[in-house]
Curated annotation (Swiss-Prot):
Involvement in disease: Developmental and epileptic encephalopathy 76: A form of epileptic encephalopathy, a heterogeneous group of severe early-onset epilepsies characterized by refractory seizures, neurodevelopmental impairment, and poor prognosis. Development is normal prior to seizure onset, after which cognitive and motor delays become apparent. DEE76 is an autosomal recessive form that may result in death in childhood. Intellectual developmental disorder with severe speech and ambulation defects: An autosomal dominant neurodevelopmental disorder with onset in infancy, and characterized by global developmental delay, intellectual disability, ambulation deficits, severe language impairment, and minor dysmorphic features including a wide mouth, diastema, and bulbous nose. Additional manifestations are spasticity, hypotonia and autistic features including stereotypies. Brain imaging show thin corpus callosum, generalized atrophy, and mild periventricular gliosis.
Protein name: Actin-like protein 6B
GO annotation, biological process: chromatin organization; chromatin remodeling; dendrite development; negative regulation of cell differentiation; nervous system development; neuron maturation; positive regulation of cell differentiation; positive regulation of cell population proliferation
Family per similarity comment: Belongs to the actin family.
Single GO term (MF): structural constituent of cytoskeleton
Subunit structure comment from the entry: Component of the multiprotein chromatin-remodeling complexes SWI/SNF: SWI/SNF-A (BAF), SWI/SNF-B (PBAF) and related complexes. The canonical complex contains a catalytic subunit (either SMARCA4/BRG1/BAF190A or SMARCA2/BRM/BAF190B) and at least SMARCE1, ACTL6A/BAF53, SMARCC1/BAF155, SMARCC2/BAF170 and SMARCB1/SNF5/BAF47. Other subunits specific to each of the complexes may also be present permitting several possible combinations developmentally and tissue specific.
Length: 426
């Protein structure tokens, strides 16, 4: 075995899973991540010489990054919000480093050079970005060993499988990724932009139609309880800073995400006005005190995930619903391995936590599955496992005794350069 072998559980390895919505990080061998905070970062152009360092603020050459929920939620003059990722891949490296620094200092509370790092990556990550990341981790953070693993493979491991079709529906996209014997089959990846953010947009439009204002909590000084459907009675805070549009939008989105999780439900059969009208309504109160019941719209909004044709403003024919994403992906794989994929369709990602998501998916797939195949849907019942499955898979992998020879050690990196990531990390 080349380059220092670490002993099984005592590795103290760190696992990072950085998604478009949140950053999950913690020690391998534990059952849930130590850190779970938004990937979105507040950015302020710092004035010269001024500026006190606050909790969760990282200063970099004239820029102050506000990282983590608390720092991000403080309204500040002109602070923009940004994300280091684009399409699931790292785009803004300076911002990405600020997130790593924050994770090490505030959550892991340890020096980077003491811990090997296993990081998850998008299955379509490019070679240049993988090499740049490897270089960053060894050169800037001086870590002893490194490994990159595709999110879908980690998700499969977290569910005790090495072969299966991973359906990952997160914030920015829904993807079906076939995994065979621990390797991603690139030709079978199918992506669709219909995911959590798309649902948020639909909710926003619903509020516009119903003429409901979205007032984020940071603007509210006091509110009075009002009757259902009555106009809200609330006081605005005085002396609010001039916040940027992007930051205000981010705060509104948080209100919408809460609404999504509390109210929406996926209909178990294709959407039907009559059936939806009989569904029990759900009561929801906005932060400013406005409250009302939601009926058919609870089912109508998430329907777009499964049947894009009835969403107005979408060229419906080009988009694939969730069920189609799965069957298309399996259809692009070799015929001999299809039974293994139908036999374990693994559901993961925060967006799949919508009520009724898996039931509807099961129904759609059982209609589309060829009669010769056995369909099995694997969806953990625990919210934690569904949100964190790539992280949990990484935690399992990095603490396996047999994995210890897989690390790219510092020595190997120094001898072989950043190219070794292509060779060692499939």
């Amino acid at each position: 075995m080349s380059g220092g072998v670490y002993g099984g559980d005592e590795v103290g390895a760190l696992v990072f899973d950085i998604g478009s919505f949140s950053v999950r990080a913690g020690y391998a061998g534990e059952d849930c991540p130590k850190a779970d905070f938004p990937t979105t970062v507040g950015l302020l152009a710092a004035e010269e010489g001024g500026g006190l360092e606050l909790e969760g603020d990282k200063e970099k050459k004239g820029k102050i990054f506000h990282i983590d929920t608390n720092a991000l939620h403080v309204p500040r003059d002109g602070a923009e919000v940004m994300s280091p990722l684009k399409n699931g891949m790292i785009e803004d490296w300076e911002c990405f480093r600020a997130i790593l620094d924050h994770t090490y200092s505030k959550h892991v509370k340890s020096e980077p050079n003491l811990h090997p790092v296993l990081m998850s990556e998008a299955p379509w990550n490019t070679r240049a970005k993988r090499e740049k990341l490897t270089e960053l981790m060894f050169e800037q953070y001086n870590i002893p060993a490194f490994f990159l693993c595709k999110t879908a493979v980690l998700t499969a491991f977290a569910n005790g499988r090495s072969t299966g079709l991973v359906l990952d529906s997160g914030a920015t996209h829904t993807t079906a990724i076939p995994v065979h014997d621990g390797y991603v089959l690139q030709q079978g990846i199918v992506k669709s932009p219909l995911a959590g953010d798309f649902i948020s947009m639909q909710c926003r439009e619903l509020f516009q139609e119903m003429a409901i204002d979205i007032i984020p909590p940071y603007m509210i000084a006091a509110k009075e309880p009002v009757r259902e459907g009555a106009p809200p009675n609330w006081k605005k805070k005085e002396k609010l800073p001039q916040v940027s549009k992007s930051w205000h939008n981010y705060m509104c989105n948080e209100v919408i995400q809460d609404f999504q999780a509390s109210v929406l439900q996926v209909s178990d059969s294709p959407y039907d006005e009559q059936v939806a009208a009989q569904m029990p309504t759900v009561h929801y109160e906005m932060p400013n005190g406005y409250n009302t019941d939601y009926g058919a719209e609870r089912l109508r909004i998430p329907e777009g995930l499964f049947d894009p044709s009835n969403v107005k403003g979408l060229s419906g024919n080009t988009m694939l619903g969730v069920g189609h994403v799965v069957t298309t992906s399996i259809g692009m794989c070799d015929i001999d391995i299809r039974p293994g994929l139908y036999g374990s369709v693994i559901v993961t990602g925060g967006n799949t936590l919508l009520q009724g998501f898996t039931d509807r998916l099961n129904r759609e797939l059982s209609q589309k599955t060829p009669p010769s195949m056995r369909l099995k849907l694997i969806a953990s019942n625990s919210t934690m496992e569904r949100k964190f499955s790539p992280w949990i898979g990484g935690s399992i992998l990095a603490s396996l005794g047999t994995f210890q020879q897989m690390w790219i050690s510092k020595q190997e990196y120094e001898e072989g350069g950043k190219q070794c990531v292509e060779r060692k990390c499939p």
